[in-house]
Amino acid sequence: MALITERVPERWEQLEELVTAILHECGMMARRKVSLALPRGSVDVDVLAEETSDRIVQRIICECKNWRTNIPREVVHAFRTVMQETGAHRGYIISKVGFQPGAVEAARATNIELVTFIEFQNIYFDKWINNRILVART
């Protein structure tokens, strides 16, 4: 499994910073601590990334949980609401250690992926390396 960084985030801020940096290095506009409007107020998201291809904008939201325990289903339920009400296309809940079985079930058949930080890096590795090659050629 190829890693983009060998850094292991010790604090939640570091996890958010690393996730933002990876998405940015993949060619996306990525920002931390973004407030998004909802039909009934607003919500703060850990990381928001947007990628435009052929004038179509894809929105990705990441919820970063640097907890020492597995993430429970209630976190997934709350994140599903955020995903639905913001119109995001893809969501990631990124965990330090993993997820409770109820969380995995709650994410099934949704546009949310439950991943560890290492799995997140693996998902974006090819895009990251291809973008670095593209940038080096220009």
Task: List the predicted regions and their residue ranges.
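Mixed-charge (Asp/Glu-Lys/Arg
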Residues: 1-138
